[in-house]
Amino acid sequence: MSPDKEPITRDNLNEYLKDLAKEFRKLNGTKTPAEIILIGGAAVLANYGFRDLTYDVDAIIVASSAMKDAINHVGDKHGLPHGWLNADFKRTASYSDRLIEVSVYYRTFSNIVTIRTVAAEYLLAMKFMSGRQYKNDLSDIVGILWEHRKSGKPISRESVEKAIESLYGKDAEIPVTSMQLLGAVFSSGDYETLYRTTRESELESKELLLEFERNYPSTLKGENINSIIQSGQLKRREGQKDSMLAKLEEKKRIVEKTKQSPDALVGHDKDGRKPR
């Protein structure tokens, strides 16, 4: 759940992409260009300031076979994990064949590798479709909307819903957690607080899954993740409630004991001695 990897930050992302383009040019030559469309956390890092890191770069890669070797060489050079840049997300629910169409230009490196990212509404649509409680999906949604509002370019609910339909169709099955956030985020006037509480909830969910993995190795699966999180949250809330009740009962017991103690009603003289 928590990868033992060096994080990819806003500061080093462009450095890695620049080195990747150089390596690709060396292996591939200059005749066949390549295109990489940044998805997910990498797209957030490239375009926004509220998030500091990701652990891998999800992307759509349109390139010759030399790109695979270039990715591995750059990973070795910088001590990055195998697959630090990959297209594995194509196997997830948030993938759509239309993502290339809705991508926007970011940068070109070494005159051969063009980097693109996903336009804001469609990046939000992907995050809503993914809706993982234990990752950054939900807080990324709030963060993106928050930054667009601060910049004077707010994104409407209608534009996000149109983007979801455009990528996934009218009958798209959006996760329950995403639907709940969709209603809350566009009615909230306080994105800062909503971002903080959403991120705290994600970190708690991640912690609960790690705890479950330690207690029940090899039983965590995609289909039971949400129920495990909900069960863990319920137990924690009940534990907090029981702890609070226990403290109140103890306080009440001490107060009652004090009231019943004769010594509590006895006065003292000026030297601090009880009168006889």
Regions picked out by a protein language model, each given a short descriptive name:
Residues M1-R276:
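Compositionally biased terminal segments of proteins
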